[in-house]
Amino acid sequence: MISYHVQQMGGSGKVVFNQRTGEIVMTQYQGSCFCGAVKFQVSGAPEAMGYCHCDSCRRWSAGPVNAFSLWPYDSFEVLAGADHIGEFHLTEQSYRKWCKKCGGHVFTDHPALSLMDVYVANLPDLAFEPAVHVHYQESVLPIRDGLPKMKDVPAEMGGSGDTLPE
């Protein structure tokens, strides 16, 4: 029988170890809205992390850029407050979710991709390791960090796959 050990990380993150081998089996991160009514958890590793510069994300986040982490549906779970989640569809590609009690934006469902975009600011224990900028053609804040700057999104996500210079 395999025995597992759960170790609390700083904050709400957890690492699950195989006690026999010491191998990390799974990492879990928890997040919430401002008031804590909506709580959620992601497990494992995100499919991608980066920055989105699209007009929609900028307006939704009220900032010049949005830091994202994309998770497969089976890695994402609402732990509490599902009845407090509001939803807005500007496009069929993005179903934006927020807490109806405090107004805090929590995540965006991308049904065509079967991915949940959990805003990095809502996962305080996640080590943010951005790999790409998407929708950079819409950028209002040029960032020179050496990461690829996608005109829209990667081809495997339905975009052109074209990159732009820094």
Please name every model-derived segment.
Residues 3-166:
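A short Gly-Trp-Pro
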